[in-house]
Amino acid sequence: MVKILKPGKVALITRGRFAGKKVVILQAIDQGSKSHPFGHAVVAGVERYPLKVTKSMGAKRIARRSRVKPFIKVVNYNHLMPTRYALELDNLKGLITADTFKEPTQRSAARKTVKKTFEEKYQSGKSAWFFTPLRF
């Protein structure tokens, strides 16, 4: 069977606090581990999406509205719905693993790195679909 949930694939979370949020898979673990004995993925997603920006707004207001609030999480495969989209995040691939979640300082440092990467991606104008909220 072909593997659908690969690193770089964009998915939607279907259950829990982040239900309806878009995530990108950073690491897929099919067999499970000791702490999570089921197929799961380490994901990074957008908790708060950037707001709409117009030409008439000033630079300070645009900067404030262009912020992205990310989250990182270990999610069961059953709670992920893959999409046809992919997002290239080369600098995050090896940085965030399942071990990152063991210590709060590592977790917050990883979240800051994800925030920086997401904001760079958003500013470049690429992957606009990923940075818009899902309408349902």
Swiss-Prot record:
Write out the entry's keywords from A to Z. Answer: Cytoplasm, Nucleus, Ribonucleoprotein, Ribosomal protein
Q: Which CDD domains does the protein's record reference?
A: KOW_RPL27 (cd06090)
Provide the GO MF annotations for this entry: structural constituent of ribosome
Q: Which InterPro entries match?
A: KOW (IPR005824), Ribosomal_eL27 (IPR001141), Ribosomal_eL27_CS (IPR018262), Ribosomal_eL27_KOW (IPR041991), Ribosomal_eL27_sf (IPR038655), Translation_prot_SH3-like_sf (IPR008991)
Q: Where in the cell is it found?
A: Cytoplasm; Nucleus
GO biological process: any one? cytoplasmic translation
- List the PROSITE patterns: RIBOSOMAL_L27E
- Report the coiled-coil segments: none
Q: Which GO terms describe its cellular component?
A: cytosol; cytosolic large ribosomal subunit; nucleus; preribosome
Principal location class: cytoplasm
Per the record, the domain of life is Eukaryota
Functional summary from the UniProt entry? Component of the ribosome, a large ribonucleoprotein complex responsible for the synthesis of proteins in the cell. The small ribosomal subunit (SSU) binds messenger RNAs (mRNAs) and translates the encoded message by selecting cognate aminoacyl-transfer RNA (tRNA) molecules. The large subunit (LSU) contains the ribosomal catalytic site termed the peptidyl transferase center (PTC), which catalyzes the formation of peptide bonds, thereby polymerizing the amino acids delivered by tRNAs into a polypeptide chain.
Known partners and oligomeric status:
Component of the large ribosomal subunit (LSU). Mature yeast ribosomes consist of a small (40S) and a large (60S) subunit. The 40S small subunit contains 1 molecule of ribosomal RNA (18S rRNA) and at least 33 different proteins. The large 60S subunit contains 3 rRNA molecules (25S, 5.8S and 5S rRNA) and at least 46 different proteins.
The similarity comment for this entry is: Belongs to the eukaryotic ribosomal protein eL27 family.
Additional detail: There are 2 genes for eL27 in S.pombe.
Name-wise, this protein is Large ribosomal subunit protein eL27A
Organism, scientific name: Schizosaccharomyces pombe (strain 972 / ATCC 24843)
> Lineage of this protein's species?
Eukaryota, Fungi, Dikarya, Ascomycota, Taphrinomycotina
Gene symbol of the encoding locus: rpl2701
